[in-house]
């Protein structure tokens, strides 16, 4: 415990962690942390501040347990194989994630416990380390992206955002099912605005289906779900309100599975999903009016003769649709 301040230092060549912290307050600034298995390793109910540091040639740049109260700015990782802030475990307080030159890397389950809120600010990049990595929400998730500064949820193998985080150039490429899901448990709330969610959706169990699996309350706006596994959104319970969002390149775009679920989707683009854009297996009606289905003729469904757009299945309101009386276009996301 206590307070440690490290400034203008070089810490290198440690077999385990260059800096290891289990409690207290630690501030590291203007330093180089290099050539160690883990540049830093911080756990427990600690307070950690990282500003203006360079991580170089560590296997893992920074290993940070989710219980740590962590703030940071202007840090870089020049080499190594896990070039970000690797985070896992239980978020036990209201937590703020902000952008940096290094992404957050979720490894395993990251749990937002009931009564706590994880807020993610514009420009933050979250990469998931492997197919058993997920964001497991029992409290509240607020994603506050902006039109020109979105929040990304993507694969560790995705070099298009935040660069080559796993340090292997093009040896691995991102693909569907690289990570699990954003799971909303009963009583959880997610307000997701201006986010890109891709390459997730891995699961062997229906309780985790979808890049977003909703048993709580989901408000999804101005976002894009694309290139995830079998399902973009799989809803088992609760409510979803979706607006101005692209849902494409899944096997099924949206699935509403039970009678305890309610879902609306408007002003969105639902297209290029392999089987159906929306499947409603519940007795409730899905209000999916004023959406773009990939063609002026509207969705493909028996009640819409001549419809050539994305197919839908079940009790779904789809008329009017974008393109019915206007030029062939997708909605503008704002």
Predicted segments — roles?
Residues 1-330:
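Beta-strand/loop edge motif enriched in small/polar residues
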């Amino acid at each position: 415990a206590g307070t440690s301040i490290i400034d203008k230092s070089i810490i290198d060549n440690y077999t385990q962690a260059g800096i290891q912290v289990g409690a207290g307050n630690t501030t590291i600034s203007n330093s180089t942390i290099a050539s160690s298995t883990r540049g830093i390793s911080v756990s427990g109910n600690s307070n950690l501040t990282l500003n203006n540091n360079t991580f170089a040639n560590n296997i893992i740049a920074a290993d940070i347990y989710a219980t740590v109260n962590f703030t940071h700015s202007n840090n870089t990782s020049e080499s190594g194989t896990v070039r970000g802030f690797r985070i896992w475990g239980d978020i036990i307080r209201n937590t703020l994630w902000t952008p940096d030159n290094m992404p957050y890397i979720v490894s395993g389950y990251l749990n937002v416990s009931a009564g706590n809120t994880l807020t993610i600010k514009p420009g933050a990049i979250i990469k998931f380390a492997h197919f058993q990595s997920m964001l497991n929400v029992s409290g509240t998730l607020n994603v506050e992206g902006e039109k020109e500064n979105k929040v990304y949820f993507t694969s560790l193998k995705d070099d298009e955002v935040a660069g080559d985080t796993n340090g292997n150039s093009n040896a691995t490429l991102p693909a569907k099912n690289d990570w699990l899901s954003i799971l909303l448990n009963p009583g959880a709330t997610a307000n997701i605005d201006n986010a890109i969610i891709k390459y997730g959706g891995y699961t062997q169990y229906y309780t985790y289906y979808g890049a977003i699996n909703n048993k709580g309350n989901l408000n999804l706006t101005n976002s894009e779900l694309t290139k995830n596994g079998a399902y973009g959104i799989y809803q088992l319970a609760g409510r979803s309100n979706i607006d101005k969002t692209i849902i494409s390149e899944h096997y099924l775009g949206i699935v509403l599975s039970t009678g305890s679920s309610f879902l609306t989707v408007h002003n969105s683009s639902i297209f290029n999903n392999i089987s159906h854009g929306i499947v409603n297996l519940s007795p409730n009606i899905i209000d999916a009016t004023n959406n773009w289905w990939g063609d002026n003729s509207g969705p493909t469904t028996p009640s819409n003769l001549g419809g050539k757009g994305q197919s839908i299945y079940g009790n779904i309101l789809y008329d009017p649709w974008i393109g019915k009386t206007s030029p062939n276009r997708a909605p503008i996301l704002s």
